[in-house]
């Protein structure tokens, strides 16, 4: 990995720079994503686009902006440096696993999550399907070499994911029009917040540009900090560099980019609207796979090492376990504790895998 201007700095100063870059990057991603979504929603409303479509597209995709910025940035970096995209793939898999185990776990511990029957019949089976498809793409159809890695999301596979994303958006809009009583309440509440911020069109356009620039900067900063920390840790402890990068992507970066979902779910729990938590997680995980992996893989095929097999399987197992809880109609506190224990066990495994 090329670190350019910090190469000649003292090690301790490099470490501080990487940590600060990572923190500032995550803060920028969270804050500027909010600005981007609010301004984009305002522009859409000024253009008389139905609020339902705004909620199911602009707002939904906006929640995946942090993951997209990080993964695309790492995808470009891997293209320029002929290296693996460990952070890009680790970010998506780690974020989805974090959403399922940490976010839902915390939410259920606060207040048991009530699950609508329609979720188990429509949205969640779709999440199971796209999760399984992504695992198949990475594990069964990946290609590799000594340079690019053992497993990959190829460009054709990424394009398929993007196409499926548009199919999913069409399905959401079609289903919402067919069953208006089942509109996504959480998206409507988010739109209600943007209504209160009645801004002029030119202001909204400027804020969209500012938000997009902030998201790009945040993504670059996160990747710079994450890769720098991974390089330092792997060099200092004589660890496998790919494993160190994967560890950072699956933990620090994944949790950081999942902060919007975590905050939204905890706030919903405190307001007694905990049933929104599962819907937020399902939507976020679907968009992470189809939108983030799809776009990043289209920019440049995403390659990584064989460790991705276990990580992808853990994500799939977490998806199935949560579905099992959801089928009972409620994720109880005991279920939430179980999810948190699973996440703690997975983090322990990641650390042990990296240092062994």
At which residue positions do the language-model features occur?
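Hydrophobic alpha-helical segments, chiefly the membrane-spanning helices
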Residues: 1-356
